[in-house]
Amino acid sequence: GNTGLTLETISQSVHYPCMMIHDSDASAMAELWFDSTLTDAVCVYLERRPGGAVIAGGKLYQGPNQCNGAIEHMTLVPGGRECYCGQRGCMDTYCSPETLPEDYESIPGFFSVLEQGERHHRERMDEWLDYVAQAIVNARSIIAGDVIVGGEAAQHLEDSDIEDLKTRVIARSPFGTDHFNLRKSYCAEDQNIIGAALRFAENYLDGICGAAERGRKSRASTKSDNTSTMEV
């Protein structure tokens, strides 16, 4: 894995400007690019190694340690399954789509059989959705905003599954936090790669957009002044 890898080590080999970004944060950056109206949300990416990200005020909010939204190692079941991080009961060990297939079955294969109505697959799916719902409830206890669900598993979720998931979240939510939107991510191909590139170009793009916005306001102000002069 890449545990312990530092930016300094990467920079020595690449010889170009570098930055490190969590894949979930990168995917969230792409969400902002795809939807300019997005302001506040908790993003939950159900990859084989799940993760999360926080969007606040229309921007990715990573915090001082660059790890806001890292829900994958939030304790979901105290003393539960062993996680690769060394702890037990982490969200990763219950919400990874790798927990869905039976022996020798692929993740797409699981969802294919699920669509056929196989009872045992339905039971496994229901249990998995319960765990995902509880993870979302836990995350929203800190940031009670809207929720975006993405990642490999989300690509296989139908609208009915998303609605079912929201119902499970509401059923577990404390009073006063059950009014929110829950939708599927855009699930674009290579979304995290797109987001990582956007993160690197963020200041440049903000400069262009900021200049354009200042120009628009200046033109509007000039037009208003001219109108006032004509009225006099």
Language-model segments: what does each one mean?
Residues 12-16, 35, 87, 91-232:
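ATP-binding/phosphotransfer module of carbohydrate and carboxylate kinases, centering on a glycine-rich
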Residues 1-86, 90-91, 208-223, 231-232:
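Phosphate-binding/catalytic loop of phosphoryl-transfer enzymes
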